[in-house]
């Protein structure tokens, strides 16, 4: 299981990569392992939509369970990974790369301070085992 040091994480297993004012969001390697084989991805927000931290941005279904993906920081949706619903298996094979879900222009960068760094996220995972 990988936890990239350059990302921030939520306690609910989402990640965000910040580049300037743009945040790219997806789910963690740990989350995809827990869900098992992802068979369905539905991104439930639209480009141009303003979404608040904690709102659902996607629904995932696996052979074991269904899960919602929540936005780690508020922003305006500037890009959606349109390929993901056609290739949901990428969530398992490349959760930090090709399986990004949306990109947002961050509207409240202070919310990032509430997220976990890689070490804190790894500690949270260890507590769950």
Identify the residue ranges that each predicted region occupies.
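Acidic, low-complexity mobile loops and tails
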Residues: 1-55, 93-129
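Short, conserved catalytic or interaction motifs in soluble domains
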Residues: 62-65, 82
């Amino acid at each position: 299981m990988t936890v990239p040091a350059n990302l921030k994480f939520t306690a609910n297993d989402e990640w965000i990569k910040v580049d300037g004012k743009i945040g790219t969001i997806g789910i963690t390697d740990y989350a995809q392992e827990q869900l098992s084989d992802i068979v369905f991805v539905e991104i439930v927000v639209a480009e141009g939509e303003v979404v608040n931290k904690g709102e659902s941005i996607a629904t995932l279904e696996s052979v074991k369970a269904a899960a919602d993906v929540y936005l780690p920081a508020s922003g305006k949706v500037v890009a959606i990974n349109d390929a993901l619903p056609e290739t949901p298996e990428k969530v398992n094979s490349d959760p930090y790369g090709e399986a990004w879900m949306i990109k947002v222009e961050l509207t409240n960068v202070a919310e990032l301070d509430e997220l976990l760094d890689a070490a804190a996220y790894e500690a949270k995972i260890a507590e769950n085992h």
